């Protein structure tokens, strides 16, 4: 479990493609007091640290994870958001983020204080004004929604301390809706579906 508060923006320094998986090495300056088995959010993707060589953190990526996330498009030099898993007693500064990416969205416009995204169809029911969403692992509040387009308000601190400061229009991002919102919407949809069946 994560909080959506990014602790470091790090650089992908190594990519090793295998037949049905891949290995990535991320150069981190701050989050190096870790051991194999530690859980990380890498751009919102829950990954397990396999090994550490000085400042280089190694993660294995499954075929399923590649299919559902932007990690398959990484190149050497890609900047990624890192967060260690929440531990007992840690402050939850954002919202609970599972690290299970549900879809890939696209940045369609960038303004001084706002960023606009196009959401994949499967996430549209869970994108509600003033609700939470994790974008590349960052806990953000949704400002406005129109169909599959929504905006978030960004303060300069968020741009400076996350990979969003490196993103351009057209970039793809990992999206995970707020789990509480998703559970409530799914429950309501299931209730109405069962009601229709019973008629």
UniProtKB/Swiss-Prot annotation:
Q: What EC number(s) are associated with this protein in UniProt? A: 2.5.1.9
Q: How does it assemble?
A: Homotrimer.
Is Repeat there in the keyword field?
yes
The record's section on InterPro entries has: ATP_synth_asu-like_sf, Lumazine-bd, Lumazine-bd_dom, Riboflavin_synthase-like_b-brl
Q: Name one GO biological process term.
A: riboflavin biosynthetic process
User: Which sections of the protein are Lumazine-binding repeats?
Assistant: 1-95, 96-188
Q: Which reaction does it catalyse?
A: 2 6,7-dimethyl-8-(1-D-ribityl)lumazine + H(+) = 5-amino-6-(D-ribitylamino)uracil + riboflavin
Q: Which residues make up the binding site for 2,4-dihydroxypteridine 1?
A: 4-6, 139-141, 153-158
- Gene (UniProt): ribE
SUPFAM superfamilies found in the cross-reference section? Riboflavin synthase domain-like
User: Which class of enzymes does this protein belong to?
Assistant: transferase
GO MF annotations in UniProt = riboflavin synthase activity
Protein's name according to its UniProt entry? Riboflavin synthase
**UniProt pathway:** Cofactor biosynthesis; riboflavin biosynthesis; riboflavin from 2-hydroxy-3-oxobutyl phosphate and 5-amino-6-(D-ribitylamino)uracil: step 2/2
> Which keywords are on file for this protein?
Repeat, Riboflavin biosynthesis, Transferase
Task: List ligand-binding residues for 2,4-dihydroxypteridine 2.
Answer: 46-48, 60-65, 99-101, 130
Write out the function statement from the record. Answer: Catalyzes the dismutation of two molecules of 6,7-dimethyl-8-ribityllumazine, resulting in the formation of riboflavin and 5-amino-6-(D-ribitylamino)uracil.
Keyword check for Transcription, yes or no: no
Supply the Pfam families for this chain: Lum_binding
């Amino acid at each position: 479990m994560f909080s959506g508060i990014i602790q470091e923006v790090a650089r992908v320094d190594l990519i090793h493609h295998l037949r049905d998986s891949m290995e990535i090495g991320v150069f981190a300056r701050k989050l190096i007091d870790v051991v194999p088995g530690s859980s990380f959010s890498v751009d919102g993707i829950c990954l397990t640290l396999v090994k550490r060589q000085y400042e280089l953190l190694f993660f294995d990526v499954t075929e399923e994870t590649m299919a559902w996330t932007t990690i398959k498009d990484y190149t050497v030099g890609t900047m990624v958001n890192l967060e260690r898993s929440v531990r007992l007693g840690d402050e939850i500064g954002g919202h609970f983020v599972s690290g299970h990416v549900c879809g890939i969205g696209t940045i369609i416009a960038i303004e001084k204080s706002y960023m606009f995204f196009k959401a994949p169809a499967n996430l549209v029911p869970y994108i509600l004004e003033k609700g939470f969403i994790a974008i590349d692992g960052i806990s953000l509040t949704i400002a406005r929604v129109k169909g599959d387009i929504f905006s978030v308000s960004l303060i300069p601190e968020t741009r400076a301390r996350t990979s969003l400061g490196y993103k351009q229009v057209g970039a793809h991002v990992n999206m995970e809706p707020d789990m509480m919102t998703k559970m409530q919407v799914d429950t309501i949809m299931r209730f109405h579906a069962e009601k229709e069946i019973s008629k």
